């Protein structure tokens, strides 16, 4: 295998200060690719287990509420310290155990249900809920350092992996297949990530490349001590503090600029809660006044909200000022327009409220992440957990609204069961 010349240097560091362990660049690329694929598979497992939990059944409403609330709450948890890394592997084993038990019970059939029925029984849903919680904890631990301190392209790639995995796994109920094929598919999705984590994959890269992916969220990229080249993965002695230049600004002038204001964190939280409550209320009013099937275009509307967020981020790159706060007034104006159209185009109003909730929530969280990343805040652990929890809450809202919009009597893409 061809090796890069810069990685064959005798010195442990190259001219740019990067640690040289003699590995080819291809090995690092492969380790990082496996790590991101692991994140995608973990998100797909979470979405697939969530679709099983939210399948129609005698306890569908309770299971769906427990799943949505649990995803929102567990997403805000801080990641364990580096010494508690085996905790994530315990969650991975619990996911395999609970998911495997749910698959076996579904295949054999519970009392009162047929083997392989599209609508799982209560015990199967409870086991699937446990597997979903375990998958969420593993996924939250994997993406924890990537939500605040990672560079922009790496963060966007991580978010794309999470969104793609959740979409594929969560949409399983719409293309559910029966018989042994469904059991084989469920087993493949469950066993795909295995009992490992994405950090295990990232740790196989060289110290220079894995540093961004496994850095503790409470640290800063510039403050992290270099790793010992003799023992990869072990931090070396802390770097001496950089002396302040005599012509630079005083310390008391630059310190406040590096501290995130509390309102920067709570504005997206309040925005999400308000937009989510308004969307759920609109859906309930529509379901009450319109008997029969729900809104079949909800998955497209949810995806359209993401497209609107992507366009907003592209527009944000053009002007020199931040558009995050003005977007709140745009969203308020759209809601006023919806109130005027509710009596003539009720279904369009529901779609607009749902898509607007997804759009404004993600836009505010992305704006918060952009500002915090520039400021390099000291309390990175709390802020990274807040960002991750807000993202997961948006998708928990999407799952919950999807259940409210599911036509009565439909189970996993079939009707009449």
UniProtKB/Swiss-Prot annotation:
Transmembrane segments: 57-77, 90-110, 119-139, 146-166, 175-195, 263-283, 291-311, 323-343, 348-368, 389-409
Listed result of changing residue 319 to A: In strain: 17 syn+ and Nonneuroinvasive mutant HF10
Comp. bias (Basic and acidic residues): 221-231
Record's signal peptide: none
Ranges of compositional bias, category Pro residues: 232-243
Top-rank taxon, per record: Viruses
Membrane topology summary: Multi-pass membrane protein
InterPro entries with a match to the protein in the record: Herpes_UL43
Compartments, record wording: Membrane
Official protein name in the record: Membrane protein UL43
Highest classification ranks of the organism: Viruses, Duplodnaviria, Heunggongvirae, Peploviricota, Herviviricetes
């Amino acid at each position: 295998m061809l090796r890069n010349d810069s990685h064959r240097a005798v010195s442990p560091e190259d001219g740019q200060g990067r640690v040289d362990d003699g590995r080819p660049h291809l090995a690092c690329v492969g380790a990082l690719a496996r790590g991101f694929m692991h994140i995608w598979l973990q998100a797909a497992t979470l979405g697939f287990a969530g679709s099983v939990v939210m399948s129609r059944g005698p306890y569908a409403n309770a299971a769906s509420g427990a799943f949505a609330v649990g995803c929102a709450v567990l997403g805000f948890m801080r990641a364990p310290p580096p010494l508690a890394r085996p905790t994530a592997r315990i969650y991975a084993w619990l996911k395999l155990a609970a998911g495997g038990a749910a698959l076996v019970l579904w295949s054999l059939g519970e009392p009162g249900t047929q083997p392989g029925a599209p609508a799982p029984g209560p015990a199967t849903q409870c086991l699937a809920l446990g597997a979903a919680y375990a998958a969420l904890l593993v996924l939250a631990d994997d993406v924890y350092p990537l939500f605040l301190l990672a560079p922009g392209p790496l963060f966007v790639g991580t978010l794309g992996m999470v969104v793609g995995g959740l979409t594929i796994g969560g949409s399983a109920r719409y293309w559910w297949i029966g018989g042994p094929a469904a059991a084989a598919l469920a087993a493949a999705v469950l066993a795909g990530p295995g009992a490992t984590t994405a950090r295990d994959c990232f740790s196989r890269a060289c110290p220079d490349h894995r540093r961004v992916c496994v850095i503790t969220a409470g640290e800063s990229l510039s403050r992290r001590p270099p790793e010992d080249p003799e023992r990869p993965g072990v931090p070396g002695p802390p770097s001496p503090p950089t002396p302040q230049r005599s012509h630079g600004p005083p310390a008391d002038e630059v310190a406040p600029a590096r501290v995130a204001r509390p309102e920067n964190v709570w504005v997206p939280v309040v925005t999400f809660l308000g937009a989510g409550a308004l969307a759920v209320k609109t859906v309930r009013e529509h379901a009450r006044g319109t008997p029969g099937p729900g809104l079949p275009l909800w998955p497209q509307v949810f995806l359209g909200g993401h497209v609107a967020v992507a366009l907003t981020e592209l527009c944000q790159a053009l002007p020199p000022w931040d558009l995050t706060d003005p977007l709140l007034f745009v969203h308020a104006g759209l809601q006023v327009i919806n109130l005027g159209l509710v009596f003539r185009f009720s279904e369009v109003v529901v779609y607009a409220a749902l898509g607007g909730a997804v759009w404004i929530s993600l836009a505010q969280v992305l704006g918060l992440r952009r500002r915090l990343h520039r400021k390099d805040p000291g309390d990175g652990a709390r802020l990274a957990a807040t960002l991750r929890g807000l993202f997961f809450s948006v998708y928990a809202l999407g799952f919950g609204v999807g259940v409210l919009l599911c036509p009565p009597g439909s189970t996993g893409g079939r009707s009449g069961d």
